[in-house]
Each structure stands twice: as structure tokens, then as C-alpha cells.
């Protein structure tokens, strides 16, 4: 017999939010690893001792982490998911009858607390330290870099203006006033036509994001676009990132200085000293190899045909051993991390502007 839906709804329900989260849900395994007391201790100095109680900082942090884990790259979409996604609501600690916050809550807390204090970076370091204590981190690392598009367009780049003397500035103002009296030269929607003009990082800057640059891998057939360089250091056993940092693009070899800085940071903050370092051909440069040797790390770098210095020769000699082969096999792991970040976690293009905020 065909059933039919009852038109009467129940007024009372006896249930818990736990019932809506499957036992094998990934967020269930991650939630016990995040300690609310640690977050509150790190954030205590960012709040006033008087006034109206704020949203608990651990809930804000859990909402951001949960959004990134689920590939949510918009604050408004995150608020919508907090309303209807029971697993995310349970992860953050909201009850069934609790309303999520406004989207501006996240942007205002980033601007007032998170950007300047570096609190998110400190919490990331706490995760790495805990992994070191549990002996989950190998002493063999892989390094790589990628280019991430900035939240700026080609048309936002204008020539860098040099300082003018007062008379020249007044003359320029008078000429612009004359042009205004003559009427608009391009009525309607004004466009920026830069065809035929030579534009580069030495002569142009973006009005939208002054820290971004024209970035390119330096290979034939690849055009430049506004973006940043993102470097990472990964341990080879469990694909844990020991360091990740966005930097202003300097040249096609700017990844090298960023990677060495991340190695120094890991040694300074975690007392972590790598034994070997795997990298692709893009790092087969004399200065980078010399920097790796100075840090007493064995470079397992893919060798190129160019380069005849003693540093290049020492790297080529290591290609014959099994450790080199294993390090090269692990390179795909860090490339997969970048691929997953761009595909699922919004790393393909930054939403915010400025080096401090990206």
C-alpha cells in the first residue's frame, strides 16, 4: 500500500546533535586533536578584561579550520554551512538551536586580532610541536614552491611614479583641469588599454594589491600574471608541513631563499634539523646547494646538465644511492599537497590582498 506524508509536524524532539554526525566522519578524528584551553591561553592577551563577553575564540578558530577542511573559501558560505551542516556545527560546538554568527564576525576578527598578532601561526606551530613529541615527523624533508594568483587584475598595474617638484605637480594639476573642462575622453565604461606597452615588476605596481607582482615559472610558453610565491617544507613520512609561507615574487629562483628561510625557522622554533632534502631541478643552483651544505643537510636534488661547480658535482655524485631515489619519489607528495590546496581549499587564488593578509 502506498504511504502518504502526514501533514502534522511534531512540536518536541528528544535528540542530540551527536546523532547527526556519523561515527566515521573525518571531523570526529580531528576534533580531539584541537585543545580549546590552548587556544584560549594564546588569545587571552587579545581581549579586554572588561566589557560584554565575546564569541569564544576557540569556536572562531574551529569554524575557520572546519571551513578549510571542507573546502569552504567564503565567509558567507561558511555561515550558511554552520546553519545547515550538522557535522560542522558539532565540530564548532554550536547547539541545535544556536544561530551562527554574521559573516562580518570572521572578517572583523581577522582585522582586529588575527592578522597582527600571528595567533594562527602560533597555533599551527603547536600542531607541529605535538607531532614532534609523538615521533610522527621524519628527519627527511621535501621542498617545493608554487605560484598563487593574487586578487588583482592586469588592469590594476600602473607605472611607478617618481617624486615631482612642486612646480611640476602644479603644472600637471592644471593640465588635468583643462582635460576635465573638455569633457570625458571615454564616455561610459572606461577601459584600460595596455596593448603594446612594456610592463614589468621594475616599472609597474598594482593599485589593488601593491605587494603582488607579475609572476611566471620562467619556462617558454607560460605567461605572467599577478600573484605571489608560496614555499613549503614537508616531512616525508606523513606529509606534515613544517613550514608554509607566502612571499613577494622576486625572480624565477625566488623559491630558493624562501625554502632556506623555512628551514632556519623550523630549526629555531622546533629545534628540528633535517638530515636530507629532496627537491626538483628548479633548485639545482649553486647558491641554493651551497646554502643546504652550510646547514649540514644532504641535498637530494634532481640534477640538471648545466652547472660545473664543485657543489653541482657533489649533488650529482649522490644520484647513485638509494636515499636519493627515495627522496625523489617523495617529491610527488608535496606536489599533491599543493594540488589539493588549489583544488579543494582555495589556494588557486588568494581572496585577500596584501602580503600580511594572504
What are these regions (language model features)?
Residues 83, 92-291:
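Polybasic low-complexity intrinsically disordered regions
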Residues 22, 26, 51-59, 71-74, ...:
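Secondary-structure capping and boundary motifs in well-ordered enzyme cores
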Residues 63, 78, 102, 232, ...:
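Hydrophobic, well-ordered secondary-structure elements that form the walls
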Residues 166-167, 179-182, 286-356:
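Helix-centered, glycine/charged polyanion-binding patches within enzymatic domains
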Residues 69, 84, 88, 129, ...:
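Short, well-ordered loop/turn and helix-capping segments at boundaries between secondary-structure elements
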Residues 51-55, 278-286, 305-307:
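Acidic, metal-coordinating catalytic cores used for nucleic-acid/nucleotide bond scission
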Residues 2-5, 9-11, 30-34, 39-136, ...:
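Basic, low-complexity intrinsically disordered segments
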Residues 1-35, 174-194:
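Charged, often Cys/His-bearing segments associated with DNA-binding zinc-finger transcription factors
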